[in-house]
Amino acid sequence: MSKKMFIRQAGNTLLNTPLLNKGSAFTLEERKNFNLIGLLPANIETIDEQVSRAYEQFSLFNSAMEKHIYLRNIQDTNETLYFRLINQHIEEMMPIIYTPTVGEACQKFSQIYRRNRGLFLSFEDQDELEAILNNAPNTHVKVIVITDGERILGLGDQGIGGMGIPIGKLALYTACGGISPEHTLPIVLDVGTNNSALLSDPMYMGWRHPRITGDQYDDFVDDCLKAIRRRWPNALIQFEDFAQANAMPLLMRYQNQFCCFNDDIQGTASVTVGTLLAAAHATGKKLSAQKVLFAGAGSAGCGIAEAIVAQMVSEGISVQQARSQVFMVDRWGMLEQEMPNLLPFQKPLAQPASLRTEWQIEANREISLLDVIQHAHPDVLIGVTGVPGLFNQEIIEAMAEDCERPVVMPLSNPTSRVEAKPEDILMWTQGQAIVATGSPFPDVVLAGKRYPIAQCNNSYIFPGVGLGVISANAHRVTNEMLQQASITLASLSPMLNGGNMLLPPLSEIQNVSRKIALEVAKKAVEQGKASHRTEERLLERIDEEFWYAQYCEYRRIAS
């Protein structure tokens, strides 16, 4: 506790301030100076003794949901202890504080609600936005995660229950990326809900109204974002879990106005490209020489596809050639240029009609996932559909028929929505597939051999991107910055050093984030999106911003 902090809070006010509370770790001198004598048990503990007790209590709970609620209670009581506990048990606790458990927490948000965290910007309060933002407990906000709760993971419209996602994401910004919780703020836009179960639930805590749409929605979001910029002009804004109809349009509208990005589109794309680059080392085949098949052609799938195209182009092939190697399949079959009602972001990825003729597929039926596998012979299969079991034995065996080491990535969250289970993929390919999933899965043992399953988790990317952006004081997040994050992640793959894991273990996530932060910051400077700084100074800035879960020594300021 060498670092000193001067504060005014005392007594129960101090104990009820999660960012400052130390609980049983307050020293005797602090207990006297801050009117805490008698408010705490006599024994003075270290933070590691507190962690031991907290972990023992955590281990007593049986269900993941109970553990999630317990950890959230610690977060709302003592944030330093919370993050110290998370950091010491990151691999065990990440699935509890975020996917897959956070999905259930969002569904049950109103039932398990205990204490306020973050801001709720309700359409009913649209004339009070400035006042609401001024009510935020954290005044020096640097990173904001914002959602409207309409597309929570694969679970659909959860209304204000979607607040669980920004809370969880920002916990990972801190646990993985070292961004002080003091500088983070979760926000949910309460624009109503179309979830009839929530509207009829007497416990639902949000605005009981069908979702606003059209100009009303666009104007409200615009008002909110501009109010946020006036309040915190340099804050990084991460869009999270907006529905397909809004996600891409919002990104396109604001990415050149604000320091912002969409994690579902760009973060998922970045970690996927990083994972594919790592897999390319294992297969010995450059990404630009591979064919990639997508199941799912929404904003997330197309965002990943465009990032793959950009990486292929950076390896020396033309955009036209790269697009010809990427195949998008949705519920109506493979995207074709002649299809009516293609969305703007789908059109560049649609294949020409001549391909149907070349493959000799009759005009009156859709081109299925299996059709593409049998005719295009892809190297990579990526799932972003939320359709469990979509990658069945026939699909996986067809992938392996013409590809010695197919890369299969069922990325849908939560676990209940995954397109295929890793153990099935490996069994159907006799252990030859390279598997990465969006949700956490245990290692698979097949024929006496252990196969680690890489979790293609955005937490490998966005914490480092955030740290890099705020350390460089960048005013934009560019696709090139995210591409640099992908390349950096791939360079840290244990496979480069003879290991059998695609991605670094989560126990090394802070080191990964720091390396990504430096490369992202350098790219921001190179592109003129941040003021010029040397690499040495950027490293110093990363060190200055990086927050460690340890207690400070308190000195009292007279009220």
Swiss-Prot record:
Keyword Kinase: no
Quaternary assembly: Homotetramer.
Catalytic residues as annotated in Swiss-Prot or TrEMBL: 98 (proton donor), 169 (proton acceptor)
Swiss-Prot/TrEMBL catalytic activity: (S)-malate + NAD(+) = pyruvate + CO2 + NADH; oxaloacetate + H(+) = pyruvate + CO2
Organism: Vibrio vulnificus (strain YJ016)
GO cellular component: cytosol
Domain of life: Bacteria
Family membership: Belongs to the malic enzymes family.
UniProt-listed Enzyme Commission number(s): 1.1.1.38
Keyword Cell inner membrane: no
Enzyme class: oxidoreductase
GO MF, any single term: malate dehydrogenase (decarboxylating) (NAD+) activity
Keyword terms of this UniProt record: Metal-binding, NAD, Oxidoreductase
Cofactor binding note from Swiss-Prot or TrEMBL: Divalent metal cations. Prefers magnesium or manganese.
Lineage of source species: Bacteria, Pseudomonadati, Pseudomonadota, Gammaproteobacteria, Vibrionales
Name of the protein in its database record: NAD-dependent malic enzyme 2
Binding site for NAD(+): 151, 264, 413
TM stretches of this protein: none
InterPro entries (alphabetical): Aminoacid_DH-like_N_sf, Malic_enzyme_CS, Malic_N_dom, Malic_N_dom_sf, Malic_NAD-bd, Malic_OxRdtase, NAD(P)-bd_dom_sf, NAD_malic_enz_proteobac
One of the protein's GO biological processes: malate metabolic process
Cofactor or coenzyme needed: Mg(2+); Mn(2+)
Residues that, per the record, bind a divalent metal cation: 240-241, 264
Name of the gene this protein is made from: maeA2
CDD domains xref list: NAD_bind_1_malic_enz
Positions of the record's site feature: Important for activity: 264
